[in-house]
Amino acid sequence: MSSSQNNNSSWIDWFLGIKGNQFLCRVPTDYVQDTFNQMGLEYFSEILDVILKPVIDSSSGLLYGDGKKWYGMIHARYIRSERGLIAMHRKYMRGDFGSCPNISCDRQNTLPVGLSAVWGKSTVKIHCPRCKSNFYPKSDTQLDGAMFGPSFPDIFFSLLPNLTSPLDDPRT
């Protein structure tokens, strides 16, 4: 990371700007600081100090590993909140997560999904609401699937059911 990045951006700005992290949305500072949202997360006070600083502190040792996991777990909680669903809806409507590779789905927009809510089990996949299948994303991302979790598409589409239509059933 260059020194100009150190002086001009926060840890969150830096992290969200890393190639491959485009599936993530910005979690607002007030949400991150709310102790209720931090319950069960390890080392939250040390990591919180680093990720909320207005400039990156490269001497902290938390530039990527622990900060990535901590932000990812807060992100997984945030995208289930009303504000988080709105942010993810915007990204979904823009097609930020890609489209379904199944030709029958006619380039249906997809959502990120984790196959597990446990950190380190798998990388993020994309989920098509039409064919109900999961695929590897075309984008170059190695985000942990726990940043979204396995229930995110179900929650999203149960609250916003008009965003997709099922595949035509040839039997009808």
Curated annotation (Swiss-Prot):
Alphabetical list of SMART domains matching this protein: CK_II_beta
GO molecular function annotations of the record: protein kinase regulator activity
A GO CC term assigned to this protein in UniProt: cytoplasm
Family affiliation: Belongs to the casein kinase 2 subunit beta family.
Annotated PANTHER family: CASEIN KINASE II SUBUNIT BETA (PTHR11740:SF0)
Additional facts recorded: There are multiple copies of the stellate gene in fruit fly, encoding proteins that are extremely similar, which makes their individual characterization difficult. Thus, most experiments probably do not discriminate between the different members.
Protein name: Stellate protein CG33246
Organism: Drosophila melanogaster
The encoding gene: Ste:CG33246
